[in-house]
């Protein structure tokens, strides 16, 4: 019942225009009433600035608009093998949209595998505002990525995407939280924020190109905040949800897509 109420509020937020969706690689707080962002350390180098997300089709080598025959489908099905990692395998780890994978994800996967962090920032052509992956061919990009991983001695590529959904609920104290008190101002929590995170991971076998995609459990939480600390509270909640989702993603990868559990 509690979860139903929370996500009913999210639905209401959609209708009222106060719901927001942010990628995990660009998760700074934006004040919905002022359209201003609360940021942590400022990004001064354009090389690591957020430029959008990697396309799942490009990472997996799925060619859009290409003619495919039934025989090709049957042959691919016959040759397909389950993607299975082994203890100590080397992983080229990519967080879509980020120059570096987040530290909690690296830490979670490093317990069982060798992790090589790799950029997930798509190249943006100077002539266009959209990401440009080189040739514009998904299969070509995927093979280039596999070649880069192979040259680095990596057995697998793991790329992950994530989004944070949030909705704000005004508390009854909203109208009085701005009233000054002797020596204090805005001391009453006046807003409740509901947030959840969704994560998706793709595993690509560097040698064969076989791949699998899965999503771990979704996590959600709710926090109250005051106006002066809204941005800071938001970022604390973001980092906590990220950590929980990363740990769940790493756990599912080990349990569902590796033989580590059977060797322990």
Annotate each predicted stretch with a short phrase.
Residues 19-22:
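Bacterial signal peptide processing site
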Residues 82-167:
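N-terminal segment of the mature soluble domain
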Residues 135-206:
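Surface-exposed short loop/turn segments
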Residues 14-17:
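C-terminal motif of bacterial Sec signal peptides marking the signal peptidase cleavage site
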Residues 103, 170, 211:
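Short acidic, gly/pro-rich beta-turn/loop elements at beta-sheet edges
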Residues 1-7:
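Bacterial N-terminal signal peptides that target proteins for export
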Residues 24-80, 164, 188-198, 204-264:
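C-terminal/domain-edge helix-coil "capping" segments
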């Amino acid at each position: 019942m509690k979860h139903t109420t929370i996500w009913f509020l999210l639905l209401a937020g959609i209708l009222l225009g106060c719901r927001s969706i942010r990628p995990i690689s660009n998760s700074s707080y934006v004040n919905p009433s002022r359209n201003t962002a609360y940021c942590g350390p400022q990004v001064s180098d354009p090389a690591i600035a957020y430029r959008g997300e990697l396309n799942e089709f490009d990472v997996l080598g799925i060619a859009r608009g290409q003619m495919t025959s039934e025989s090709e489908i049957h042959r691919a099905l016959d040759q397909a093998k389950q993607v299975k990692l082994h203890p100590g395998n080397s992983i080229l780890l990519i967080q879509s949209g980020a120059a570096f994978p987040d530290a909690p994800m690296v830490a979670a996967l490093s317990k069982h595998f060798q992790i090589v962090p790799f950029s997930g920032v798509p190249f943006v052509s100077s002539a266009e505002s959209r990401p440009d992956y080189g040739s514009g061919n998904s299969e070509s990009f995927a093979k280039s990525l596999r070649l880069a991983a192979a040259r680095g001695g990596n057995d697998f590529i793991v790329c992950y995407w994530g989004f944070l959904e949030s909705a704000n609920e005004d508390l009854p104290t909203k109208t009085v939280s701005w009233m000054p008190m002797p020596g204090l101002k805005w001391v009453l929590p006046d807003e409740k924020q509901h947030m959840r995170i969704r994560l998706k991971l793709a595993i690509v076998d560097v040698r064969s190109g076989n791949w699998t995609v899965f999503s771990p459990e979704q996590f959600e939480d709710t926090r109250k905040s005051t106006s002066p600390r809204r941005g800071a509270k938001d970022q604390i909640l973001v980092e906590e949800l990220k950590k929980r989702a990363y740990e769940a993603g790493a756990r599912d990868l080990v349990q569902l897509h590796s033989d580590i559990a059977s060797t322990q």
